[in-house]
UniProtKB/Swiss-Prot annotation:
It comes from Homo sapiens. The modification Phosphothreonine is found at residues 326, 329, 338, 401-402, 639, 759, 784. One of its GO terms (biological process) is positive regulation of mitotic metaphase/anaphase transition. The gene is DLGAP5. Residues 153-284, 628-674 are annotated as: Disordered. This is Disks large-associated protein 5. The lineage of its organism: Eukaryota, Metazoa, Chordata, Craniata, Vertebrata. Belongs to the SAPAP family. Its main location: nucleus.
């Protein structure tokens, strides 16, 4: 019988070829019947075919003869009724159906006989020994019985009874090894050990042997406990008894409770009597087994030669302390080879542990018959030392335990250690994950509420930003990851989802979430440290924040410029950013040390230097020498583009010129401004000057040349005839010129900080890409000529001030305008000379 027959039959029945074959067969049968009917009809008399049933042939003949009145002899026959004809046809069809059904049954029976029976069922393997109860283990062993050729006679049974009585009277009996006895005596010794329940056997039983076996169940069970004393007993004993495994079932089945109780008593006797057994070197059941077992099964032993040399004894290594020799005994093998069915075997009751010990001993002896059988007949010499060592080991264990635990197997302690190792790695379940999720949610929520309340306090904005970041990230974590994890826990508990979610999956997901939890907790810890330090944010943190803000401003200013050499610009910006950051750090430290110095707001304390492909923003420190007039509120610009557009339109379309002050008013104010600029220039820290010298190696020479430029400014301005021919508007709006002059410095600095688009169009030396259509005006052409002569001045602060001044100022004459412009230009050159660098634009490119 095999599954292939069933599969082929299944395919044969549903195959298209089989269906076609059946249809063709039916057609051939129907054609054959039709041919026969036609043949009968043509012959006009009914010849009965053997293949057609008798009833059908008779009806066909009658139908043919009645339907055709060709024969004169049959003309006087009465026609049959239609109802009768239909009834006969139905009977005929029924008969045909029954015959076909019976044929089908016979055919199926023949096919089944050829094919065999296909059995479907559940495979139930034998339960492991540590899960079997005592009764199941006892009942399962008779199935393993193998018939033995040894026949028990009445004399042998009597010898067995006498031997068991002697074993009951004395626990240990010394037997001297002597010459080998006759074959009958060997067989009788063999039968003495066959009766013991732990040694399975199924011998041919006579009536007297059965009665003897029933009379001594208690004595048999008492001898069981002495069997696993030494390794030699364990190795030699199973050898002759491998093929017989069914005997102990009958003995223990009769009185199992008594057998267990006897084993408890004998176990205590074993521990106390091993010293006497080893002192005589001939314990009961050890040398007798060694004498008799090899001689009984010599034929079987010859077929299984050991790979070890003769008289070789298997011993553990010298360094082993945990197992040593004890695993070779059945009791130690119980714990080593088969796990205990309880997690805490030392806390169980004595009766349960003893029952388990008996079952495990039986199973382990069955196992040992297969593994240690090879060398059982080769260990007669070193038996004494082995037994002595084992006796000492067992006695030491017995002293360490209490009186109530004497019945427990000695080597169940390793099983307890293994169980403890398993307990050390608990398997998390759904309740565990729900509890930890709830606890983490409550903890993080409390953190969020605590820091939300601190946002209402008067703390720096930087600290508030950090608090908002930590709280927001925590709430996002609880909203997203915690909700997702809660859904996975529900899927695991209620078995939902496309794929099954296991506790291992939950454990892995929670490990990932725990990293994010640690991150937000680290942020809260940093906030606590920040609060303890008085909300003083670290310099690195401030530096990073300022750098980010500054980069945003630069990007917004350059967005309208055509992009060329982006890689070079980015590299130059990065290098300059490092230098500027170091400079800011030094200045910030000096500001903290000099508390008496008045500090200008952040909007004013920067000088922006734009060289076309990079931009330098330097802080400015103003001391008490600065006049009060320069500290007035600055006139803020709306947007740089709007100012630029307004100025260019006012110059080109309306013809409004740049207004300057009168000579009387301009002189004192310019002198005062120059004094302010000199003070500012001299008050710059040495560290900043050294850094700027590193940026521009030729800076000292350029500063000296600024004085030459100051002397030639008037001549250059006079030569610009285009600027002198500008029309003037009379009757303009009269403003306070002195106020505008006082606000000049702050307006220049602030306008340059806001955006570089104005500077890009009005600097004296700029790259070609910054020249826009607004430079077509006559005023800016004049400024271009000035830039050709002032090659070393990179920043035109004069035109910056002109753009910031009101275009509607009243003026007396063009000479006053020219003189004021020259004075302002000279003043700003002396003011900004420390920021001169080279420009890639050549004078001939204008």
């Amino acid at each position: 019988m095999s599954s292939s027959h069933f599969a082929s039959r299944h395919r044969k029945d549903i195959s298209t070829e089989m269906i076609r074959t059946k249809i063709a067969h039916r057609k051939s049968l129907s054609q054959k019947e039709n041919r026969h009917k036609e043949y009968e009809r043509n012959r006009h008399f009914g010849l009965k075919d053997v293949n057609i049933p008798t009833l059908e042939g008779r009806i066909l003949v009658e139908l043919d003869e009645t339907s055709q009145g060709l024969v004169p002899e049959k003309t006087n026959v009465k026609p049959r009724a239609m109802k009768t004809i239909l009834g006969d046809q139905r009977k005929q069809m029924l008969q045909k159906y029954k015959e076909e059904k019976q044929l089908q049954k016979l055919k199926e029976q023949r096919e089944k006989a050829k094919r065999g029976i296909f059995k479907v069922g559940r495979y139930r393997p034998d339960m492991p020994c540590f899960l079997l109860s005592n009764q199941n283990a006892v009942k399962a062993e008779p199935k393993k019985a193998i018939p033995s050729s040894v026949r028990i006679t009445r004399s042998k049974a009597k010898d067995q009874m006498e031997q068991t009585k002697i074993d009951n009277e004395s626990d240990v009996r010394a037997i001297r090894p002597g010459p080998r006895q006759t074959s009958e005596k060997k067989v009788s010794d063999k039968e003495k050990k066959v009766v013991q329940p732990v040694m399975p056997t199924s011998l041919r039983m006579t009536r007297s042997a059965t009665q003897a076996a029933k009379q001594v169940p208690r004595t048999v069970s008492s001898t069981t406990a002495r069997k696993p004393v030494t390794r030699a007993a364990n190795e030699n004993e199973p050898e002759g008894k491998v093929p017989s495994k069914g005997r102990p079932a009958k003995n223990v089945e009769t009185k199992p409770d008594k057998g267990i109780s006897c084993k408890v008593d004998s176990e205590e006797n074993t521990l106390n009597s091993q010293t006497n057994a080893t002192s005589g070197m001939n314990p009961d059941g050890v040398l007798s087994k060694m004498e008799n077992l090899p001689e009984i099964n010599t034929a079987k032993i010859k077929g299984k030669n050991s790979f070890a040399p003769k008289d070789f004894m298997f011993q553990p290594l010298d360094g082993l302390k945990t197992y040593q020799v004890t695993p070779m005994t059945p009791r130690s093998a119980n714990a080593f080879l088969t796990p205990s069915y309880t997690w805490t075997p030392l806390k169980t009751e004595v009766d349960e542990s003893q029952a388990t010990k008996e079952i495990l001993a039986q199973k382990c002896k069955t196992y040992s018959t297969k593994t240690i059988q090879q060398d059982s007949n080769k260990l007669p010499c070193p038996l004494g030392p082995l037994t002595v060592w084992h006796e000492e080991h067992v006695l030491n264990k017995n002293e360490a335990t209490t009186k109530n635990l004497n019945g427990l197997p000695i080597k169940e302690v390793p099983s307890l250690e293994r169980n403890e190792g398993r307990i050390a790695q608990p398997h998390h379940g759904v309740p565990y994950f729900r509890n930890i999720l709830q606890s983490e949610t409550e903890k993080l929520t409390s953190h969020c509420f605590e820091w939300d309340r601190k946002l209402e306090l008067d703390i720096p904005d930087d600290a508030k930003d950090l608090i908002r970041t930590a709280v927001g990230q925590t709430r996002l974590l609880m909203k997203e990851r915690f909700k997702q994890f809660e859904g996975l826990v529900d899927d695991c508990e209620y078995k939902r989802g496309i794929k099954e979610t296991t506790c291992t999956d939950l454990d892995g997901f929670w490990d990932m979430v725990s990293f994010q939890i640690e991150d937000v907790i680290h942020k809260f810890n940093n906030l606590i440290k920040l609060e303890e330090s008085g909300w003083q944010v670290n310099n690195n943190m401030n530096h990073n924040m300022n750098k980010n803000v500054f980069r945003k401003k630069v990007v917004s200013g350059i967005a309208s410029k055509p992009k060329q050499d982006d890689a070079g610009r980015i590299a130059a910006r990065n290098r300059l950013a490092a230098i500027k950051n170091a400079m800011r750090e030094r200045i910030r430290q000096e500001e903290c040390a000099e508390t008496a110095v008045s500090v200008i707001p952040k909007e004013v304390d920067k000088i922006v230097f734009d060289a076309g492909f990079f931009r330098v923003e330097s802080p400015v420190k103003l001391f008490s020498g600065l006049s009060v007039s320069s500290e007035g509120p600055s006139q803020r610009l709306g947007t740089p583009k709007s100012v630029n557009k307004a100025v260019s339109q006012s110059r080109n379309e309306m013809g409004i010129p740049q207004q300057t002050t009168s000579p009387e008013n301009a002189g004192p104010q310019n002198t005062k401004s120059e004094h302010v600029k000199k003070t500012l220039f001299l008050s710059i820290p040495e560290s900043r000057s050294s850094i700027e010298d590193a940026q521009c190696p030729g800076l000292p020479d350029l500063i000296e040349e600024n004085h030459v430029v100051n002397k030639t400014d008037l001549k250059v301005d006079c030569l610009s005839s285009e600027r002198m021919s500008l029309p003037l508007l009379a009757g303009g709006v009269a403003d306070d010129i002195n106020t505008n002059k006082k606000e000049g410095i702050s307006d220049v600095v602030e306008g340059m900080e806001l955006n570089s688009s104005i500077t890009s169009q009005d600097v004296l030396m700029s790259s070609p890409e910054k020249n826009t259509a607004s430079q077509n005006s006559i005023l800016e052409e004049g400024e271009t000529k000035i830039s050709q002569s002032e090659l070393f001045d990179n920043k035109s602060l004069t035109t910056e001030c002109h753009l910031l001044d009101s275009p509607g100022l009243n003026c007396s004459n063009p000479f006053t305008q020219l003189e004021r412009r020259h004075q302002e230009h000279a003043r700003h050159i002396s003011f900004g000379g420390n920021l001169i660098t080279f420009s890639p634009l050549q004078p001939g490119e204008f």
